[in-house]
């Protein structure tokens, strides 16, 4: 049994994440998805709660045919012990998938196998781009799995993002 670990903020989970996880699913038996910065929500850069992100990811991943875990991981702001923190919050895993330089460095320093998955259309499959499209009324739905769009609709996520992005003129 081989488990892989993949972490992201998933604000929101998008097709770039999904394509990476499809690739990972061909290499491991089980996938652990870590939801980073799990304690932050209702901001322009992190509009969705950990629970909302779990629902998005769960709906999108059901079709992969692999066992997966979705684990919220709050920030601890102590890089020297972060890998130990992650390991204490997740089932054991053998390989880490990431392109984030800090994540790669920390897991490599801890002696873990780290793989850098290909990135897919990063110029459009980007949480920053998708959130901007939501705020501006652009076509963001084509950039996320259908299950994610459904969750965002159910929680009125676009309305929330537009409201919190307004300037305070008081």
From Swiss-Prot:
Entry GO terms, CC: cytoplasm
Catalysed reactions, semicolon-separated: beta-nicotinamide D-ribonucleotide + ATP + H(+) = diphosphate + NAD(+)
Transmembrane feature ranges: none
Subcellular location(s) per record: Cytoplasm
Pathway entry: Cofactor biosynthesis; NAD(+) biosynthesis; NAD(+) from nicotinamide D-ribonucleotide: step 1/1
Swiss-Prot/TrEMBL GO biological process terms: NAD biosynthetic process
A Pfam family annotated for this UniProt entry: CTP_transf_like
E.C. number(s) listed in UniProt: 2.7.7.1
Family: Belongs to the archaeal NMN adenylyltransferase family.
Protein name: Nicotinamide-nucleotide adenylyltransferase
Taxonomic placement: Archaea, Methanobacteriati, Methanobacteriota, Stenosarchaea group, Methanomicrobia
